[in-house]
Amino acid sequence: MAKAYEELELKDDFMFSVIMRDPKYVKPFLETILRIKIAKIEYPEVQKNIDIAAGAKGIRLDVYVEDEKHTVFNLEMQTTTARNLPKRMRYYQGMIDLNILEKGDDYNHLKKSYVIFVCTFDPFGLGRHIYTFENRCSEDIALTLNDGTVKIILNTKGTLDDVSPEMKRLLDYVDGKGVSDTFTRDLEEAVQSARQNEKWRLDYMTLQ
């Protein structure tokens, strides 16, 4: 049974999507995860739908943003264990590429892209908070394909000391452990405010 709108948390797909529509939340979220500085966030569309061809499986992306360098970031919230998570990530990244490249375009026009899944479970059972995947040479692990694609799985149930304190606090907040710093407090205030938004309430009810 679906949650009442007033009970939604950041880890709920709908709430995550609406909160991350605001650059003042998605920008520090990405900066904390990737340990980079982003000058500007752009939203090509509020919620990205990609349908390449009739008969092909389309996708709706929770969060699709670009930075000032036109790097693409796709953020997805995943709260249920999914056996097909790796292949789903592969499909999403492929669809993003197909959406970017126009017919006849040079492959150099493909943008660097990150597909990031925030999971409230550990899909690999290794205790890591973050699993980062890039294409590498099996014979020489130091050699990357440098194809501009990165897949990241975040695990809110991580137990290892493998991420920054800021990222640990963020993942703990997503997992429902409460606020512990300025950013998680800002996120909680955004969630409380969103619960009072009548338009979003109606949008949520329409989806149920």
Where are these regions (language model features)?
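C-terminal segments that line or cap access tunnels to active or ligand-binding sites in enzymes
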Residues: G148-K151, T156-L160, L171-V174
